[in-house]
């Protein structure tokens, strides 16, 4: 009898070699025929076997091991809903696709789309059945004309892929179909000045359309914004950018408000505030007192916004933690320096093409780029090691030490992504992120020296830098994530007081305090335009020195759990409530007490905005506060994507 392995073992084995882009069927044939293994499963049809493999890939997507690409490069209409699946190293998983409509994993081999076209979601797509097929000769002429255009007019080659360019070509085809070839091109094309005026008028028209919406969000206290600055190193010119965030009809909305040059002025607090107010005034917003700002800890920005509610950018704080941790440990500092040396040598020597994947460069303003750089070297270690040997280049680390650092920082990358998202609430994940990092950095007797040193420095710096700069806004946002409402027992009184101060209509509320220290219950504000934080300043003046030893302890939000993660929610909430409790023994007088007593289970696909939408009638005032807080981004990192 031939050797055998179980189906689960087989799938795990295939997953381990999928990093080299080995399709499922190729690996299956190799195992069964070349190695003489038999796969033990119940006699099933091939469709059932493939379904098990598809479920295996789908689980990897659900737990965050795999991700879904934005778009597949293809001309067929099916690629509007089908996309590639990316592995941990961001390379494409060969042999599988993901359907955005039904959320299913589909097999895809040898670029054959016939089976994909029969997928139920693809059958519903409108197909351009009346389009004519262009001959190969005409395609060659099109290539020639496009090449001449990009060369003569100095356009990027990617210009032909733009949606605007394609719309322009379609328009010209329609003109040709109506008038034929006898058309004066110069008469059809507009003058550059006409284009400029048209673009300006369109911009003014769209600006007027969104100005009323922006002003309404600001006046109602539902608006927040991120502010960041960037320097053009070539001309030594500073720029300031602002993104605008708000909630509308239970949906999070965000937009780039604008980028402004400092016009070679010094980036003083006065000049920064003037630019910020100038950008808002372009949208008819003259008073920005109600806007909550998320920024880094730059002294000039802090001074400029001292009259506003300002929260620290969580991604920036986490970056500071990691940067300081590496700089304080010579062994870790040498690893980063050596990795930068390797990337620089490979690029200057034109050796990138000899590697399986491209080496990533580190960006000084984006600390998680260091992780991507180290991981890209680890993924290409065999080739990199060979290159270093041939060039007689010595580095201050080995593969083992690099791997342990990359493994630790892998979960940090996941946290970075969660904090930097703007399409879904992120501020409620700030406290869970800290708790998760404290768990990940717990000392282990089996840790190598590099791992132990990194964990030690992170634990110390996260308490000094990040935990010391938390505000009541972060605690309240976490409190308003229903499955976690009961997890901040020590801070619950402070959170209650803050929530009541932020609710803009009177509610019946009675505080029964058993503590010897009784804080003053703030009165309901008469004007809804002044959201203040009465209890806790958002940014301590001396964040490097914690107040008491107790402030250095973990928030203890979650119990310890093994590192087997089955979903993104479980990554941040290891032990959530699993049973609902909406029946109470007594009837509290206010929404907050009623909300605290309720136990909301955390499902795998729990959506916090959707929950508040469904419970808006039960919590009419608290739901408005929740949406206002949850629309605040945790990070200003998204704005950096606007900068070159």
From Swiss-Prot:
One of its GO terms (cellular component) is nucleus. Signal peptide: none annotated. GO terms for biological process: DNA integration; DNA recombination. One of its GO terms (molecular function) is DNA binding. Residues 514-560 are annotated as: Disordered. Keywords: DNA integration, DNA recombination, DNA-binding, Metal-binding, Nucleus, Repeat, Transposable element, Zinc, Zinc-finger. Its main location: nucleus. A zinc finger (BED-type) spans 73-131. It is found in: Nucleus. Gene3D superfamilies: Zinc finger, BED domain-containing. Residues 521-550 are annotated as: 10 X 3 AA tandem repeats of T-P-E. Pfam families: DBD_Tnp_Hermes, Dimer_Tnp_hAT. Essential for hobo transposase activity. This is Transposable element Hobo transposase. It comes from Drosophila melanogaster (Fruit fly). The lineage of its organism: Eukaryota, Metazoa, Ecdysozoa, Arthropoda, Hexapoda. The gene is T.
